[in-house]
Amino acid sequence: MSEIIRIGMDTSKTVFQVHGVDAVEQPVLRKKLRRRAVLAFFAKLAPTKVGLEACGGAHYWARELKALGHEAVLLPPQYVKPYVRRGKNDAADAEAICEAMSRPRMRFVPAKTAEQTAAQMLIGVRDQLIRRRTQLTNAIRGYAAEFGLTAAKGLSHIEPLLARIENDQALPELAKELFATLRQDYARLKLQIREIHAKLAAWHRNNELSQRLAEVPTVGPIGACLLAIKVTDPHAFRSGRDFAAWIGLTPKDHSTAGKQRLGAITRAGDEALRQALVVGATAVVQQVRKGRGHPSAWLVDIVKRKPPKLAAVALANKNARVLWKLMVSGERYNPHRERGRFVPPTGSVASRSPRQGRFAPPSAVALSQP
C-alpha cells in the first residue's frame, strides 16, 4: 500500500469510516471500523494527517489521535457538505472530509483540551439549569392561574406565590400536594444554579484572561468567562473584524454589479457570545441616551444618528474587536487609549426616533424604550 498522506474519518456512536489518499490523491484506504478498534488501527499507522467533522465527540478523538502522534484537524460540517459528491452514506462523508481538508483556504476548528471541555461544560450546565427553571416557573404560573392566583413578573414573585398557594384553604388537597412537589423542584434548581454560579466565579478568579476581559465595559464576569472558554485560539483570526464576523456581528452582504447592499447582521457563530456582547452594549446605550457615564465621541455620534438597537449592535461589534486585540496581545484594557473621548452635557443625548426617522428631542428619547 502506498504511503498515506491524509485520512478523513466519519465518526458516529459505534461505526467509523476512514478514507485515505496517497501523494497523487488516489484512494488507498477505505475501511469501516468499530468504535473499540479505532485507536488500535491508528496506533499501527505511520503518523499522518487525520480530519474529522467538528461534531459530538470530535474533540475527544482529536486528543486521542494526537497522543498517537497523528495531526488531527477538525472541520466545520457546513464546509464539508459541498464536497459530498453523490448520495449520503458513511463512505461518501469520509471521502468528502478527506477532500475538504486538502483545500488551502479551509478553516479548521481548534481542538479543545480536557480542561477546556470541562469549562465549556460549566457554561452548558448553567444554561440548561436556567432553562429548566424558566420552564418550571412558567408551569407554576400557569397552574396557579387556573385557580385564580397570579403574580407579577420576575423570579422574586415565585416564592410568595407558592406561599399563597400553600395557605389557600380553597385549593383541593391534590392540587396542594402537586404544588408542593413543584416547590421542591424549584428550591432544588435554585440551589443548583447558585452552586454553578459559585463554580463559575471561582473559575473566573483563577483565570487571568477572563479577569482581563472583564475590565472592558459591557462585558462583565459572565461574558468574560464565555469568551475565555469558547475562544480557545484567538490567533486563528486574522483581524478583529474576522472575530466579529465569527460571532455574527457583521452585516449580511448582498452586493452585486458593483453596488454594495448590506443587510442585517448575519447572526452566525456562537449565540451565547453574541447575546452577551449585545446585552452589555444595550445597557451602555441606554445610559448614554439618559446622559450618564463618560462615553466616547464615537458612541455619542452613533446614538444620535442611529436607532438604539442598531447603536447597541455597532458598539458590540467594536467591543468584539477590542476583545480580540486583548486576547492576542496579552495587554490589559486601557480606556484612555480610545480617541475622541467626550463627556456629554447634563441631560439626555438626542437620538434618532425609530418611528419618525428623525432626531427626537431629549425628553422623547428619555421616555422611549430601545
What are these language model-derived features?
Residues M1-P370:
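A detector of single, family-specific signature residues
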